[in-house]
């Protein structure tokens, strides 16, 4: 044995939960001046603005940086009241064992403060669990320094380093003096003075005498006695039959014992290769040498034969998100010049390129300029989080410039999410490209213009955030005006493009503003983009947005006041009508307001007698507005519910509807509008309808409901033909779409039908295969719908199936676009995506069945319809749901 030895633990053997100790938070925030409190009293609700050591909560969570998925749920440290400083000194036990952690796992520590009745984030801090240098689990105390707007960084504090060395055992322990010295060291740390609005959080990892080194746990099904060439012997005393019937005998024998090869008729054995999933170093070296020459003229003239062309076509036709093997990447790279005229091949070339390698990156970026122009769906794919090279993203933005405003509106929600990837801190590779920097301070005249526009834009932001967005508050008020004016506004290429298009098209500008506003709760740096957009608007357009913000603030105040009233629905309705007549109506009488849900509609009054309060714990409001052209626009306004998931689903339905119409297939879909105007508030377009449950209770069937409104004795079913046509088409469209999106929790109370026969779904709280009920059907097709068709032998049922097949076929052809849009939403805070980003995209991809031919896909969908028609369990669950609703009432 060597004279020197190193002792350590391996993480795969540490089956204990991870613990983190929250010690203290140092630092002070600038307090509000008396004048600021008078100007905006709402700012005083944020406790840290008025109290130096305001109460705070701390939550700790483990997440995986590679998959962007959460490993654990957030765990809160016990509440501790503060007096002279923010000191917790509390251990938090996380529900994950050390052996399950990887170097990609990080801690997400969120400091929470109070804003009136709400809990809002003060700062989100991330820190690795393992050291980057040697992959050892962190030990001892760690200090994390941060500002409200800056990126947190681990601070080296000599006092804490000394304490850690004591914990590690580097100093000899003497009990009589250790306690005194430690107290003095802690006091010295407390004396550290930090600048105003600068903070330092100290946490402690468990102190273990020996370091814990990360090791990957081998697979559980690994063969224990691994066969090698040195221990095979055909003349072994063991027979193949004996080794097969008694595995224990084989795996527990002396290692020197020969393992039988078997007889000549059965000589095939399975080997375990521990390196089977690792990169082959020889192939890796070959790849580097092959691609090292920048001017490899031979590749420019290489052309594939017929067999190779088919192979390349197969690779190019892979759906977005599919990983390429090393051989597939090599083939794409070899024939890259041949593929330059194939617009679909560019994304596969980028997948096959190591953009971190300067030689490869330079060559590919040069080739992109001469590549065949890619489609918009491929351009969207290049804006995902996987592509961090700004030259690639700028190339995609240049392609988007050729898209029409109507197309951009369809993708705007995802494009705003893509802007979130372009935070300066997230890019490690900025070569061959740069950000567009909009610096208004370049001249005194520009500076003067900016000051005027900035003050107006901040008025809009202030009026909107007073009840909604506490993260805006600090970004506007935490620094002196002189400090703010010195900062340039840094805008990424995509954000700059969207701002310019939003300035030209007022409809795009309306949705851009509200999408950015709702996302800024999770991405504070979006405030900078929002401010840049507002500062460039002319005074009339800024005034329009300000009026919208004010109207929604009035509605929010009405909703919160009604929610606080603990009384009957009729009393709440009376209060609503009083509030609308005294607050909302006078506001609309003085000015015309463009509807945020649809800026083409202008509101001039509210129809108080047609407004109501829904029976729900959130007390959503039913508001009917009178429009400038003499029409009415009913909508539902909710506070306390995150509508961003519903907004996403309805946007995808609208997109699919447009894709179908582009193929001259109109399935009479009703993609009503949903707009999330904040983290937990928003508006929903209200379409007059009845739920299937109400129709069955009142009319005892769908056909009697149609006959009551559109009778026709000359028709076979006694209903006007256009009503049945609407019903059959819309049922087919929504069956296909809800199947593809994995919409769950379907019951007769969220299946809706209009008097004109249009069928549609509501309430998208469960998507992508999520469902609160056991054994949910892949497609919801109640027997009452089949009965309304005229039965399974009717012509309407055959039409329904044909429409389903056509819609499924068209949407499969556009699967790349839909999957790329979901890829852009992968890092969003949509609940059913956030729980498993990779898995959620995979579920959508699986339902497209892209590996099937057109005929096989049609047969697959026919089987789905047959299973749904004959399913009994959904009928039982519907009855149980109705029974539960009855007892709740």
From Swiss-Prot:
The lineage of its organism: Eukaryota, Fungi, Dikarya, Ascomycota, Saccharomycotina. Its EC number is 2.7.1.137. The gene is VPS34. Keywords: ATP-binding, Autophagy, Endosome, Golgi apparatus, Kinase, Membrane, Nucleotide-binding, Transferase. Component of the autophagy-specific VPS34 PI3-kinase complex I composed of VPS15, VPS30, VPS34, ATG14 and ATG38; and of the VPS34 PI3-kinase complex II composed of VPS15, VPS30, VPS34 and VPS38. Residues 34-184 form the C2 PI3K-type domain. Residues 613-619 are annotated as: G-loop. It catalyses: a 1,2-diacyl-sn-glycero-3-phospho-(1D-myo-inositol) + ATP = a 1,2-diacyl-sn-glycero-3-phospho-(1D-myo-inositol-3-phosphate) + ADP + H(+). Belongs to the PI3/PI4-kinase family. Type III PI4K subfamily. Autophosphorylated. GO terms for molecular function: 1-phosphatidylinositol-3-kinase activity; ATP binding; protein kinase activity. PANTHER family: PHOSPHATIDYLINOSITOL 3-KINASE CATALYTIC SUBUNIT TYPE 3 (PTHR10048:SF7), PHOSPHATIDYLINOSITOL KINASE (PTHR10048). This is Phosphatidylinositol 3-kinase VPS34. It comes from the Eukaryota. It is a peripheral membrane protein. It is found in: Golgi apparatus, trans-Golgi network membrane; Endosome membrane. Disruption phenotype: Leads to large vacuoles and defective respiratory growth. Blocks maturation of the phagosomes and renders cells hyperadherent to epithelial cells and susceptible to the antimicrobial arsenal of primary murine and cultured human macrophages, as well as to thermal, salt, oxidative, genotoxic, cell wall and cell membrane stresses. Displays defects in protein trafficking. Residues 761-782 are annotated as: Activation loop. GO terms for cellular component: endosome membrane; extracellular region; fungal-type vacuole membrane; Golgi apparatus; nucleus-vacuole junction; peroxisome; phagophore assembly site; phosphatidylinositol 3-kinase complex, class III, type I. Residues 607-873 form the PI3K/PI4K catalytic domain. Residues 742-750 are annotated as: Catalytic loop. GO terms for biological process: ascospore-type prospore membrane formation; autophagosome assembly; cellular response to potassium ion starvation; endocytosis; intracellular iron ion homeostasis; iron ion transmembrane transport; pexophagy; phosphatidylinositol-mediated signaling. Residues 298-540 form the PIK helical domain. Coiled coil: none annotated. Multifunctional phosphatidylinositol 3-kinase that plays a role in signaling in modulation of host immune response, intracellular survival and virulence. Catalytic subunit of the autophagy-specific VPS34 PI3-kinase complex I essential to recruit the ATG8-phosphatidylinositol conjugate and the ATG12-ATG5 conjugate to the pre-autophagosomal structure. Also involved in endosome-to-Golgi retrograde transport as part of the VPS34 PI3-kinase complex II. SMART domains: PI3K_C2 (SM00142), PI3Ka (SM00145), PI3Kc (SM00146).
